Every structure is written in structure tokens, then in C-alpha cells.
Amino acid sequence: MARIAVLCGTGMSALASQLASAPGAAVNTMRVDSEWGQVPATLVSVDEDEVLIIDRHHSDSGSRTPPHGIEHRANVHAAASFQPELVLSINSVGSMCEELPPGSIGVAADVLDLAERPWTFYDDHATHADRTSCFNSGASEVCAKALEDTQGQVASGLVVAQCVGPQFETPSEIDALERLGADVVGMTLGPESRLVAERGILHVALVCSSNWAAGRTPGSPEAEIDHDTVDAMAATMRESVGECVKALLS
């Protein structure tokens, strides 16, 4: 039996329904208690495998927690309480990498997180988690192979820059991040990678290119970034994400 916890957000609201469409699948919704608040989650069981899906934004019909307001400790605590073999983060990003145009999915290898806010489970006792290899190479390779079957070329080994949001970045910020080694930029993976490392769980991250980063749209460097368009683009990649989940379970 395989158990995977999935942390997802933009464009992935129907991921649980997609996985639940498999023959014999069962779906249960639940709320996981934590000292940082309750976390809504969906458990999808297929044969002997289980996938716990957590919408990091805790979206419902009336509201959606903005990226800077997400309580990542609650989400990662809920994921860890499931005792998964692996945590899969699915992150919508802006791309500054020609090999990762909007509509394609890449595989993260590292995080560039210089945000000032600390994220830790250990506020009262100094505990230092190693982050030399944030993401499991074996699981990353499984995802890359699954993506090759669905989209062909796959950008892997990507460095994900963390920005706090909720505003999109400026072209100058993107230029600076690229000089520091970033390939893509997002608003959620940095805290998740820190907290998953503290819990000692294997981690893999898919980056869904939903837009060109600010100032990087080919032929139109002044093109604006619109969240509705970003969300719609992310949703087009949901089936490929589902194939990665299936590959990780096998």
C-alpha cells in the first residue's frame, strides 16, 4: 500500500475528483485538527493506495486564503499526520525559463527562499533541519518520466524562487532572482519545503508554469499578469499532475 499527501492550490480544485474517477475509488472528506487551526482534506482511496489531498488555500465557495495568509504549519502538520511515504507539492509558478513555457510542468530541484518570515515547528527549542537536498531524486525522476509521456520535453532540476505575494513580482525583481539562480517564481513552495524537511518526510515538487514571469513574455515584455488567466492555465495541467500521482503510487 502506498500513501501520498498532496499539497496543491491554484488550478487544482478538481484534482480529488479526477483521481476519484478511477474504478473502485472511494472518497472521504475530513478536517484535521492542529494547534494552528483545522485543515480541510480529501482522502482518495484506490485499491490499497491512499492519497490525502490538501488545498493549501482552504478554498470554499466564498473565500480563498491568499498566499501570504496561508498557515503552512497547519497544512504540513495535517499532511504529516497521515504518515505518508511522500509529500507532493504542486505549485503554480511564473517562468523565466524558455524550456518551461506556460502550460507545461517541470520538476523542482531546489528552492531559493530569502523571505524574512521564518517557518518552523520549533519556536521554543533550536532545531536545525538539513536542506541540502530538498527534494527526493528518485521521486523526481518518476514524475519526470510520467511527464515525458504526457507532454514530451520536461524541464527538471529547476530552482524555485519564493516570493511572499499576494502581488505578482516586478520585472526588476525577476531579473534579480534569475541572477541568483532561479528558473521560476512562486508564492508557496518555500515554507512547505522548510516544514516538510523538519518533519523528515520525502518531498517532491511539481512546478506548473501558469504564466511568463513579469517582463518575460516573448515579444511583449509589458504584458500584464492576471490571476484568472493564471488559474485557468494551471487547470489545463491537472490531468498531467494526476498521471504523476498515479506513477508515484505504482
Regions flagged by a language model, labelled:
Residues 1-129:
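Metabolite-binding pocket within alpha/beta catalytic cores that recognizes anionic/polar moieties
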Residues 76, 174, 190-193:
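Generic hydrophobic/aromatic pocket-lining and core-packing "Φ" positions
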Residues 78-83, 99, 180, 194-202:
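Alpha-helix C-terminal capping segments
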Residues 134-179:
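Active-site rim beta-loop-alpha module in soluble metabolic enzymes
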Residues 187-227:
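Zn-dependent metallopeptidase/amidohydrolase metal-coordination segment
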Residues 214-250:
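His/Asp/Glu-rich mid-to-C-terminal helical/loop segments that flank catalytic regions of hydrolases
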